[in-house]
Regions:
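His/Glu-rich zincin catalytic helix
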Residues: 1-51, 156-241
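Charge-rich, well-structured scaffold segments of protease-associated domains
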Residues: 48-199
Length: 241
């Protein structure tokens, strides 16, 4: 799809892959698969990717949601040949390097442990579990050991299943030129890419909301009780131990 609007010579390119938390086989698989795309490909390592995008004034966003993964590039039109080369490599040939993955996982574990001492974080986890139930992707809470189960092979499995040409939609917006469309079609539309060309399976989950009206959450450090949950039909009671 193309939305041609704006006066600045900038184009936004969005690639959507149908595959997110609802399709993953284990917690964090979809998130880290998407996150690691920029950490190394067959042609470029993480430093080269960052350097090239910075040099050409481009910006790359990676995100993963419940049913979709997103790869978004903002680029000046005059540098599209260079920035699209990086984008193509990121999407088609990531290598999920073990060293870089280990560093990112360790950093995320540390952040998880820090957040686990914060009341707002714990209260949010308690509320989503009460709303959706522990077997629903929205209520299945990530634990520390889930981070340690993330490996390059786990990410490669998810990538091979969902990151392919038969499961990719592309949206262009900004100052979209004919040259831009031609380049996108040449890179992503002329030849199939990926290994598994099946469409994602249709998965349905039904929330199992708790019948209780109070949620008790034990924390091991003194803290203040937040007041931001008044819109929910439960009372969150924080018990410090």
């Amino acid at each position: 799809s193309v939305l041609n609007a704006g006066d600045n010579e900038v184009t936004r390119i969005d690639l959507l892959m149908a595959g997110g938390r609802w399709q993953q086989k284990q917690p964090l698989q979809a998130l880290f698969t998407n996150r690691m795309l920029r950490e190394g490909t067959r042609r470029y390592d993480a430093a080269q990717i960052a350097e090239k995008l910075d040099y050409y004034g481009a910006w790359l966003e990676l995100s993963s949601a419940s049913e979709y993964a997103y790869v978004t590039l903002y680029s000046l039109n005059k540098y599209l040949p260079q920035t699209l080369d990086v984008l193509e490599s990121i999407v088609k040939e990531p290598v999920f390097p073990e060293k870089e993955l280990g560093v990112i996982v360790d950093n995320n574990i540390q952040q998880f442990l820090v957040n686990s001492s914060k009341v707002d974080f714990l209260a949010h986890r308690g509320l989503v579990k009460a709303l959706y139930g522990g077997q629903h992707p929205g209520g299945r809470l990530v634990q520390e050991e889930d981070y340690r189960r993330i490996t390059p092979a786990v990410l490669r499995e998810f990538y091979d299943r969902y990151y392919h040409s038969n499961n990719c939609s592309i949206y262009l917006s900004g100052k979209v030129t004919g040259d831009c469309i031609h380049r996108i079609e040449s890179l992503f539309g002329c030849e199939a890419f990926g290994t598994d060309f099946r469409k994602p399976e249709k998965t349905e989950f039904h929330p199992v909301t708790t019948s209780g009206k109070r949620i008790f959450i034990d924390v091991r450090t003194p803290c203040k009780v937040p007041s931001v949950w008044a819109c929910f039909p439960w009372t969150v009671i924080i018990r410090t131990t």
